[in-house]
């Protein structure tokens, strides 16, 4: 039996009570992961005020219900978040196209490369082990973090999350990647010269 990458004990060590979570954050990013078979989609939020990043999972459901609610949710928040990082072979392209059609700002929607997806997985694993993230109780995210195993990506030794329920923790890693690497500042106004 393959061991989980994060595991229940390590993940439980990053748990905080909901009342201790700030009501607002200086920087916010979203991560969206479609499951490999395209049957489910997960949306995670990563936010920080300069310290540890806080992770939540507001959306995780079958794609059979469609993605209209997810697209709307992401579009109305585009003016407050630095980015949304969208990954997955099934559904990701259509989601990105719909967001662009709704006129979200340039640079808001990001599609990660294989190397960036690898970085996202290692980033969330490392952050869980070093106290770099917090989260509130969320059964879908907690189960994913406790059970997701290692999946090889490419031939260069890269890895990501695998297993039956990896989409929530992968979405969290993508959100954390966006939070730490995006240069987009939604509060900055463009200057016309």
What is each stretch, according to the model?
Residues 44, 94-100, 107-193:
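C-terminal nuclease/phosphodiesterase catalytic domains that cleave nucleic-acid phosphodiester bonds
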Residues 13-19, 37-90:
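Nucleic-acid-processing active sites and adjacent nucleic-acid-binding tracks
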Residues 27-30, 39-41, 82, 170-172:
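Structural beta-strand/beta-sheet cores of well-ordered domains, especially the beta-sheet scaffolds
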Residues 33, 87, 167:
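Acidic active-site catalytic centers that drive phospho-/nucleotidyl reactions
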């Amino acid at each position: 039996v393959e061991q989980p990458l994060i595991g229940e004990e390590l993940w439980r060590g990053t748990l905080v009570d909901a009342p201790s979570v700030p009501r607002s954050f200086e920087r916010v990013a979203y991560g969206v992961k479609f499951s490999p078979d395209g049957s489910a989609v997960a949306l995670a939020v990563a936010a920080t005020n300069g310290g540890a990043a806080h992770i939540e999972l507001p959306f995780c459901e079958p794609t059979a219900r469609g993605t209209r609610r997810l697209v709307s949710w992401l579009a109305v928040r585009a003016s407050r978040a630095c980015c949304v990082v969208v990954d997955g072979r099934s559904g990701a392209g259509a989601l990105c196209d719909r967001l662009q059609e709704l006129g979200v700002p340039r640079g808001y929607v990001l599609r990660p490369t294989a190397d960036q997806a690898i970085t996202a997985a290692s980033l969330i694993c490392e952050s869980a082990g070093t106290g770099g993230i917090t989260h509130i109780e969320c059964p879908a995210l907690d189960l994913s973090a406790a059970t997701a195993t290692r999946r090889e990506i490419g031939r260069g030794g890269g890895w990501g999350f695998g297993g039956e329920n990896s989409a929530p923790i992968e979405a969290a890693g993508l959100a954390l990647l966006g939070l730490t690497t995006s240069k987009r500042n939604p509060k900055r106004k463009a200057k016309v010269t």
